[in-house]
């Protein structure tokens, strides 16, 4: 679990996300509280429960982006999922306990990657021996093997093709056991049943350099204790897991609607025990959800947070409102973040040998058009900038391979020429922008 301070988390998020200081503070405090709880001892540690968060704000203001960036910072099992994917237990569809099964799989992969690094040196030696076996045969003399080992380490043989035996992945078709739907153990892979028994292999023809990664992973997995790995992954989920539940406003039952809706109120009821704390059975073992942090988010355009079940509202005690984006925010989004849209397009065109030069008045014009279209058609926040940029740079993107070595100056006049009329015509922009 990461031990960086809330201030450092906020400054890291500031590199990629413009504004929304309240939301950044809330998630940074929640993340730090995970670490604080780990420092406690005795029964008090079990009593400290995470304070789940509800983010409320219009679409395209940074709710999902905060979650994405938080996942990279957290160094903990993280799952982002849409609430609309689920149906009430007993109906065809995914039940909410699948959230826990999915985050356990994420944690197992994370833990395996971390542990592979610990045994990488031994795995590399074992992989090297297998490559040498493929090159000179298992019965070659020590002198021959040493000679080839030197050439192998110098990179001389990287492009040489060899045949290696590799383990087949434990995939295969998935099915559910009748009478035991996803609520019990989830879909079972045939590989889970038969894969461990025979240890099936297949012969593959690869270059030496391509074979290394596959063989190192295989040899690493042989050195790992799979039971211990699973236990560590489950412990990581139970203590540090973070679930980002997007589109929670879409499962609200709005006033005046009647009739059954299996993916709305029923899903809310099923979420209650999961967020409050329950034990979920997975194929890897039982997982307790008491200390998993849930961050829910929704635009709440039509529904209101008060349309959620009162019990669910009580389980999301921290409310954070994200502000709608202003013209100044949109202007900053175009230029300030490390991976801003303008930097992305400049880098993309640079691969074709075309230099894009954006002037300040072009940035102003792009922001003005995005604001104008958002106000007349539908406010989709910063996502509108992508549509506007694509439209402005459409001609350059198409002709770039023929313009190698050119420098294209993008100013306000260029922007207006390519998109100005569309932005003014509300009917056209409704369909094109």
Curated annotation (Swiss-Prot):
PANTHER family: ATP-DEPENDENT CLP PROTEASE ATP-BINDING SUBUNIT CLPX-LIKE, MITOCHONDRIAL-RELATED, ATP-DEPENDENT PROTEASE ATPASE SUBUNIT HSLU
Function comment: ATPase subunit of a proteasome-like degradation complex; this subunit has chaperone activity. The binding of ATP and its subsequent hydrolysis by HslU are essential for unfolding of protein substrates subsequently hydrolyzed by HslV. HslU recognizes the N-terminal part of its protein substrates and unfolds these before they are guided to HslV for hydrolysis.
Key words, A-Z: ATP-binding, Chaperone, Cytoplasm, Nucleotide-binding, Stress response
Highest taxon above the source species: Bacteria
Annotated SUPFAM superfamilies: P-loop containing nucleoside triphosphate hydrolases
GO BP term, example: protein unfolding
A GO MF label: ATP binding
Organism: Nitrobacter winogradskyi (strain ATCC 25391 / DSM 10237 / CIP 104748 / NCIMB 11846 / Nb-255)
Nucleotide-binding among keywords: yes
Location of this chain's protein in the cell: Cytoplasm
Record's protein name: ATP-dependent protease ATPase subunit HslU
Pfam families assigned to the protein according to its UniProt record, in alphabetical order: AAA, AAA_2
């Amino acid at each position: 679990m990461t031990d960086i301070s809330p201030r450092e988390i906020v400054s890291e998020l500031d590199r990629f996300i413009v504004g929304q200081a309240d939301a950044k503070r809330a998630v940074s405090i929640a993340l730090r509280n995970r670490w604080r709880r780990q420092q406690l001892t005795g029964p008090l540690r079990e009593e400290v429960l995470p304070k789940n968060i509800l983010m409320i704000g219009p679409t395209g203001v940074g709710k999902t982006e905060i979650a994405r960036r938080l996942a990279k910072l957290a160094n903990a099992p993280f799952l982002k999922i849409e609430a609309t994917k689920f149906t009430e237990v007993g109906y065809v569809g995914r039940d909410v306990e699948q959230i826990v099964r999915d985050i356990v799989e994420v944690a197992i992969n994370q833990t395996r990657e971390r542990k592979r690094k610990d045994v990488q040196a031994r795995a590399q030696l074992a992989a090297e021996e297998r490559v040498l076996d493929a090159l000179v045969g298992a019965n070659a003399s020590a002198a021959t093997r040493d000679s080839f080992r030197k050439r192998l380490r110098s990179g001389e043989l990287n492009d040489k093709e060899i045949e290696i035996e590799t383990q087949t992945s434990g995939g295969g078709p998935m099915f559910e056991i009748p009478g035991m739907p996803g609520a019990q153990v989830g879909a079972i892979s045939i590989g889970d049943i038969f894969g461990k028994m025979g240890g099936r292999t297949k012969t593959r023809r690869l270059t030496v350099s391509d074979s290394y990664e596959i063989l190192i992973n295989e040899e690493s997995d042989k050195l790992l204790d799979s039971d211990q790995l699973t236990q560590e992954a489950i412990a990581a989920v139970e203590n540090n897991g973070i679930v980002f539940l997007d589109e929670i406003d879409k499962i609200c039952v709005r006033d005046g609607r009647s009739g059954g809706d299996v993916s709305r109120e029923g899903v809310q009821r099923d979420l209650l025990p999961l967020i409050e704390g329950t034990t979920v059975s997975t194929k890897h073992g039982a997982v307790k959800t008491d200390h998993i942090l849930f961050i829910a988010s929704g635009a709440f355009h039509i529904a209101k947070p008060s349309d959620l079940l009162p019990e669910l509202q009580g389980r999301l005690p921290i409310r954070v409102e994200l502000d709608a984006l202003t013209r100044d925010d949109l202007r900053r989004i175009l230029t300030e973040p490390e991976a801003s849209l303008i930097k992305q397009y400049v880098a993309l065109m640079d691969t074709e040998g075309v230099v894009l030069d954006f002037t300040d008045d072009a940035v102003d014009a792009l922001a003005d058009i995005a604001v104008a279209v958002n106000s007349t058609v539908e406010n989709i926040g910063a996502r509108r900038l992508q549509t506007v940029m694509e439209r402005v740079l459409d001609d350059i993107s198409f002709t770039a391979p023929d313009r190698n070595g050119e420098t294209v100056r993008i100013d306000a006049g260029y922007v207006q020429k390519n998109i100005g009329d569309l932005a003014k015509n509300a009917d056209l922009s409704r369909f094109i922008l």
